[in-house]
Amino acid sequence: MSEIENSRLVSYAVFICTLAVVLLTVTTIIFPALFSYYFGLYSENLEPFELGYQAVFLVITNIVIFSFGIAYYKKKIPSFLDSIIEKIRTFELSKNVTIIVLAIILGIYVGLSTPELLIDESTQWGDYDVLDRALELWPYGESDDVYVQEQNDRYVRMILLDVSHNIFQNIKILPFIASILVVAFTFLITTQFCQKRFAGIISVIVLLQANTFLKFDTIAVYENFWVLFFLISLYTIQRKWFLSPVFYILAFFTKAYVAPFFLMTLFTAYRSEISRRRKVAILSSYIIIIAAAVALIFFGETIYPDVIEINSSKFILGFQAISSQLRFDIFFIVMILPVTVGLVLLSKNNKHADSILVLIFGSIIASPALVMFTFHYDIQAYRFVPLLVFFAIGIGMFFSKKVSE
């Protein structure tokens, strides 16, 4: 089997896996009670095929999008419209213009979000009380409350929040800076994957319109430190590969939820245009890092081994929770299925389209897997910030066509 054929098989395998979890998520938008009826504890008064309030809108918009997409792919649209689309997809910004545009976008974002730093977080989120008690005990105190102790087991996060609280006198400062950097690295990763600055700008705009991202961008109790560290671990694969596992372990000790994400990092490295020797080095470094982290968790004094409890029915119900948590991100809900299908077509010319599919797959399936294997956690909206980032990068990839293609 040739290398090209093998590459296409990988692309199709990745696409099928991602399509499966996306369809499970979309199904719960159309039929919100379907999974609860068959897998939930209280199904007596449920109508499994009752349409959700977004169902008709979702189906109609997807029919329109797919119809237009097929017509464009088959060259069946009017020539003037095809010409406009091609000009947009091949358009590029100069480096200086990109810096100005990005500065304006970030300036508007920071300006509109800064007033949120003055809001008392204890009046916003009930979970802040747990964080407040954990900070009082940090770094040497212990608690019988599993929720408080879990906070203090996230060492990197607590150090950063402690610095923000005690040095900057505002616990929201560093979480907000982290969110700004998440936007910046969304641009950098898109530009790296697509080799187009315009694609990076598109991704930034898509991320900044996401309700879930804007809802949690200044929140300390649901900070984005872990998202930032994971994005840096992806970005450094092609820049300074030896830093990738370092930032991954920082992400892990910021939020253990990121633990399985290393598989996505390794796949991204596999699809990257780097030498085989470097790929082996990255794999080896991650094996060492993961082994050390597992040893610390199971042989150290952390709560994580004590919260494991397997309940397979919660896995399917997890997809229902995803659609519920992201119901206000209308653009994501409408576009996630078309983007998934479109990325497999883009993967013919850009292997990083496969990487984005894997990142979307992992970001979706991580939450159902988490609730299936533990009793301590439930599915929260802030955990989907990485999904929105990778979705935004996926959108950007449609604007990465080179003139020669």
Predicted regions and their residues:
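Transmembrane-helix signature of polytopic, membrane-embedded enzymes
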Residues: 186-209, 227-228
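Loop-to-helix entry region of an early transmembrane alpha helix in multi-pass inner-membrane enzymes
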Residues: 151, 155-184, 216
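Membrane-interface alpha helices of multi-pass inner-membrane proteins
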Residues: 242-267
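Perimembrane helix-loop-helix junctions
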Residues: 260-289
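Hydrophobic, aromatic-rich transmembrane alpha-helices
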Residues: 182-187, 331-355
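Extracytoplasmic catalytic/substrate-binding loops of multi-pass membrane glycan-assembly enzymes
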Residues: 114-136, 140-160
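Membrane-interface transmembrane helices that cradle and orient dolichyl/undecaprenyl
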Residues: 230-243
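Short acidic/glycine- and proline-prone juxtamembrane loop motifs at membrane-interface regions
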Residues: 214-223
